[in-house]
């Protein structure tokens, strides 16, 4: 299976915007792409503003909202915690079983995690365990601001300790008038982590299909991305 697992150094770093943009970019280059975001918290998967809806719209997949996101919870918390509040526990086997049912429906997949790679998804597993099981290279979405060097370095080193392949890092959310830290962080992160920067993307005032696709086309290194995916 070709594709990527998109994770982040934190929550609210723009994983879904990047994931959906990558899916649209691959689609525009004639790739048969599907999307999978197994967990969603705090919003209905069918809501037009949900991560699931954006992923579905941008990828143009025929997969249903339930196919894309089989496990959804009401509380805006880590999936394991949100599930416990509802008396629900999702096992690793359930996540992988659902993946097995949809993975053959597309040539490649963009899979999006929940928060960072250490977020608990169930009683005895984290996002990192799902990444390892799916065997997809990671794309790490990181903030551009002060503090991101440490967060990104720790994410990379933990991933390496788990034997997880890392395709690259995307620095997301650069402001219109970047401070000195925003200007220098990408180069420092690439040097310290030894992982390629796939792109440095701006903060979007409005998230639409058009603005997201325009952003990734202008700011993501497509040739490097394709090379990391082996196409």
Swiss-Prot record:
Principal subcellular localisation of the protein: cytoplasm
Residues involved in substrate binding: 41
Cofactor(s) this protein requires: Mg(2+)
Annotated pathway: Cofactor biosynthesis; biotin biosynthesis; biotin from 7,8-diaminononanoate: step 1/2
Group of enzyme by EC: ligase
EC number: 6.3.3.3
UniProt-annotated binding residues for Mg(2+): 16, 51, 112
Catalytic activity: (7R,8S)-7,8-diammoniononanoate + CO2 + ATP = (4R,5S)-dethiobiotin + ADP + phosphate + 3 H(+)
Compartment(s) of residence: Cytoplasm
A Gene Ontology cellular-component term: cytosol
Residues engaged in binding ATP: 12-17, 51, 112-115, 202-204
Annotated GO MF terms: ATP binding; dethiobiotin synthase activity; magnesium ion binding
Active site: 37
A biological process term (GO) from this entry: biotin biosynthetic process
Any Pfam family the entry gives: AAA_26
Keywords: ATP-binding, Biotin biosynthesis, Cytoplasm, Ligase, Magnesium, Metal-binding, Nucleotide-binding
Family named by the database record: Belongs to the dethiobiotin synthetase family.
Complex formation: Homodimer.
Physiological role: Catalyzes a mechanistically unusual reaction, the ATP-dependent insertion of CO2 between the N7 and N8 nitrogen atoms of 7,8-diaminopelargonic acid (DAPA, also called 7,8-diammoniononanoate) to form a ureido ring.
Official protein name in the record: ATP-dependent dethiobiotin synthetase BioD
């Amino acid at each position: 299976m070709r594709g990527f697992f998109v994770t982040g150094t934190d929550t609210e770093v723009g994983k879904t915007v990047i994931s959906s943009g990558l899916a649209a970019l691959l689609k525009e280059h004639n790739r048969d792409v599907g999307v999978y975001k197994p967990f969603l918290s705090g919003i209905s998967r069918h809501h037009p503003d949900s991560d699931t809806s954006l992923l579905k719209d941008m990828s143009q997949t025929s997969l249903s909202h339930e196919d894309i996101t089989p496990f959804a919870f009401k509380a805006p918390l880590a999936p394991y915690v949100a599930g416990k509040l509802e008396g629900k526990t999702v096992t690793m086997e359930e996540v992988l079983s659902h993946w097995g049912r949809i993975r053959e429906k597309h040539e490649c997949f963009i899979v999006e995690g929940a928060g960072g790679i250490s977020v608990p998804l169930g009683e005895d597993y984290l996002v990192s365990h799902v990444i390892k099981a799916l065997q997809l290279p990671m794309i790490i979405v990181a903030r551009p601001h002060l503090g991101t060097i440490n967060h990104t370095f720790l994410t990379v080193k933990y991933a390496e300790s788990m034997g997880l392949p890392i395709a690259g890092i995307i620095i997301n959310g650069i402001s219109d008038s970047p401070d000195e830290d925003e200007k220098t962080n990408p180069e420092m992160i690439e040097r310290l982590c030894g992982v390629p920067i796939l792109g440095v993307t701006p903060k979007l005032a409005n998230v639409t299909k058009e603005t997201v696709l325009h952003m990734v086309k202008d700011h993501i290194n497509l040739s490097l991305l394709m090379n990391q995916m082996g196409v």
